[in-house]
From Swiss-Prot:
PTM-bearing positions, type Phosphotyrosine: Y89
GO process annotations (BP): cell redox homeostasis; lipid catabolic process
Subcellular location: Cytoplasm; Lysosome
Protein encoded by which gene: PRDX6
Residue positions, PTM Phosphothreonine: T44, T177
Lineage: Eukaryota, Metazoa, Chordata, Craniata, Vertebrata
Record carries keyword Nuclease: no
Protein name, UniProt field: Peroxiredoxin-6
């Protein structure tokens, strides 16, 4: 599909109608991190579980200065009515209020602009719906991460939170996070940092894994 964003691209400063009124995207983000995530349709089973989990994790994102905003091709009216079902799914009072807004993209303008349409999933009129896309933007409004899932597979919002924690850590410190890393685990020293500099940067210690190649590139340090 036309449109789409690449890592490092600045988010378009679009305007949109949402469940909390009309927004301009850059103003909504402010100086926060932001997650824009699309779902195929309101009142569907997988989407209900996804937004329910996002709502449960919203306080964890908020304390890390991350704003959430959802999007689909449904109307604001549908979003508000569906929010009651989402809250009921979470065993909470079935109100129209969620801890994040949902964008009304019934004309698919943003879905086309951002490359969010899934040509394999069509509505009753034969029009493509939105895929399960996740965009993570930094305070500089640049895209730091993108994830694209098909309609049939729900996303793991705990994994999205884990990735955001990694993105924020590695934006501040000269480290990388290894496979299956969790907050609090040891991290990896970037291979571009000379050994003597690494000792100064990481006073908790740098631990090198000995390898048959003799190359000292697997270097760990406790999470800064």
């Amino acid at each position: 599909m036309p449109g789409g964003l690449l890592l490092g691209d600045v988010a378009p400063n679009f305007e949109a109608n949402t469940t909390v009124g009309r927004i301009r995207f850059h103003d909504f983000l402010g100086d926060s991190w932001g997650i824009l995530f699309s779902h195929p349709r309101d009142f569907t089973p997988v989407c209900t579980t996804e937004l329910g989990r996002a709502a449960k994790l919203a306080p964890e994102f908020a304390k890390r200065n991350v704003k959430l905003i959802a999007l689909s091709i449904d109307s604001v009216e549908d979003h508000l009515a569906w929010s009651k079902d989402i809250n009921a799914y979470n065993c909470e009072e079935p109100t129209e209020k969620l801890p994040f807004p949902i964008i009304d993209d019934r004309n698919r303008e943003l879905a086309i602009l951002l490359g969010m349409l899934d040509p394999a999933e069509k509505d009753e009129k034969g029009m493509p719906g939105t895929a399960r896309v996740v965009f993570v933007f930094g305070p500089d409004k640049k895209l730091k991460l993108s994830i694209l899932y098909p309609a049939t597979t729900g996303r793991n919002f705990d994994e999205i939170l884990r990735v955001v924690i990694s993105l924020q850590l590695t934006a501040e410190k000269r480290v990388a996070t290894p496979v299956d890393w969790k907050d609090g685990d040891s991290v990896m020293v970037l291979p571009t940092i000379p050994e003597e500099e690494a000792k100064k940067l990481f006073p908790k210690g740098v631990f090198t894994k000995e390898l048959p190649s003799g190359r000292k590139y697997l270097r760990y340090t406790p999470q800064p």
